[in-house]
Each structure stands twice: as C-alpha cells, then as structure tokens.
C-alpha cells in the first residue's frame, strides 16, 4: 500500500501542471486522437444539422433581436436558454417542439430584461423568423458534390418534421437529401446519446459508420461521445467544446468539408 502511494505521488510529480490540466497529453490519448484524424474511410451516412450548419440565421437573429427591443446582445442568451430548456425537457422525460421551447425562452429572456412579450407574440416571432431562411452561399454546391460522389445525405435536426420540410422547400434543399430525420420522432433532443443511436438505427447503420456535420460544438460533442465521427463547421461565433474528443474534420464552411470527404475511400 505504501509503495502504491509513493508511486502515485511520484507520478504526480512527473505529470506536473501539464498532466493535471491536460491529462490526454500524459495518459496516452494522443495516439487515439491521431487515429481519429487519419481515418479516411468513407462514412456510410452523412448526417447534417440544419440551422446555422446549412441555413443562414442572419434573418432570424434580426427578427428575434427586434422582438427584444433591438437588444441583439441578448441573442446568444436566448439561444443558450432555448438549448438549456430543451435539455431540461428531455432529462425530465418530456417533449415539446423546439419552436415552442424557443418561444418560451424568448419570453424568459425578455422578462429578465424588462421587455414584455406575450406567449402568442413569442410564438409568432419564432415561427416567422425560421421561415424563408436561405442556405449559406456554398451549401448547395457542396451538397451536390457529395451526392455526386455517392454519399448518402440525411438531415438530422432538433426542429419538427413539418418545420424542416418547409425550411428545405423555401431554401431549395429538398432534392439534395435522401432522408430527413427529426428528433420529434424519438422524443429526445440532441445531444442525448439515445438520439444519435436512434438515428443510426433508423438508417440501418452502426454508430461508427455515421458522421455528423454541424456548426455547433455541443452537437459535435454529443455525436462523438455517441460513437459517431464528426465534422465541425466553424461558422462565426461557434466553437468546439475543448473537453470533448478530437473532431475528425474542422473547416470554415461546408465546401471545405466536402473537399476533404471526397478524398475518402
């Protein structure tokens, strides 16, 4: 026992501050991360997040900001509140449409900042702001390239089935996808592990044969922890979660992600 204790203390000394703050560098996960980065086998299915990843949210942010009396500085708080309560809803064994949670979050943020928004007003703001969102400029060309290369493309969103259907019709994205998946059908929001497992089963593939492409660090983290591969699009204001495993592909837009994926065999 004393020898074990002495060895433990000795190892702590060897690790030093670097080992305590960045254990991956000391405990041998470097090779694992290297393997992730050099995996160039083709995923069987590419799953795409929708809002921010494929669709440009500039218009939505302006409308929500207007509802908050021009307080665009509150937009990030509104979105994180919406995400927080989607997690609360799932963790409590409940389900509400993401749009309804977004409207409730809008009311909460407004109330905390002395702004009055009724339930009906909040729902109209969220519903109207999500309609007619355009695709990011590079999205259609990138999707066409991936489809031409034989990839199976599936959208995978926290939004409702009807909501994403209308969004795709408006943005002209419908024909690029083989399938549309919504968490509405499983009743659990991303990034819960069960939700990614459900999507893999739905498409008849193993978790390790899936790749999520998303512009949200929380979504990418959830996918990787669920055993998926992932590509992160670093849209402005978006960051990877530093405590999550390494992400296989990190690029600034979907075209650059596609350029990497077409080299996979």
Where are these regions (language model features)?
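Glycine-rich phosphate-binding loop signature in dinucleotide/nucleotide-binding domains
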Residues: 40-41, 149-151, 203-206
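An amphipathic alpha-helix signature
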Residues: 61, 75, 79, 99, ...
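A metal-dependent, Asp-based hydrolase signature
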Residues: 72, 86-124
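Substrate-recognition element of Asp-dependent hydrolases with the DxDx(T/V) motif
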Residues: 121-134, 139-169, 181-183
């Amino acid at each position: 026992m004393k020898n074990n204790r002495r060895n433990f203390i000795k190892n702590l000394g060897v690790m030093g501050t670097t080992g305590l703050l960045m254990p991956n560098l000391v405990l041998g996960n470097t090779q694992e991360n290297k393997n992730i980065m050099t995996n160039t086998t083709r995923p069987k299915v590419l799953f795409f997040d929708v809002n921010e990843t494929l669709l440009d949210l500039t218009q939505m942010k302006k409308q929500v900001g207007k509802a908050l009396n021009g307080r665009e500085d509150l937009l990030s708080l509104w979105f994180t509140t919406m995400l927080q309560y989607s997690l609360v809803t799932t963790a409590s064994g409940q389900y509400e449409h993401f749009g309804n949670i977004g409207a409730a979050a809008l009311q909460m943020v407004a109330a905390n900042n002395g702004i009055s928004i009724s339930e009906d007003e909040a729902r109209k703001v969220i519903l109207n702001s999500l309609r007619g969102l355009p695709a990011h400029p590079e999205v259609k060309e990138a999707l066409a390239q991936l489809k031409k290369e034989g990839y199976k493309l599936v959208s995978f969103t926290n939004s409702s089935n009807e909501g994403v259907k209308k969004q795709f019709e408006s943005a002209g994205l419908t024909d690029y996808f083989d399938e549309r998946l919504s968490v509405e059908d499983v009743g659990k929001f991303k990034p819960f592990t069960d939700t990614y497992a459900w999507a893999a089963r739905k498409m008849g593939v193993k978790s390790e044969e899936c790749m999520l492409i998303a512009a949200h660090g929380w979504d990418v983290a959830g996918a990787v922890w669920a055993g998926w591969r992932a590509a992160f699009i670093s849209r402005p204001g978006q960051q990877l979660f530093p405590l999550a495993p390494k992400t296989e592909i990190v690029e600034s837009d979907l075209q650059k992600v596609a350029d990497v994926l077409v080299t996979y065999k």
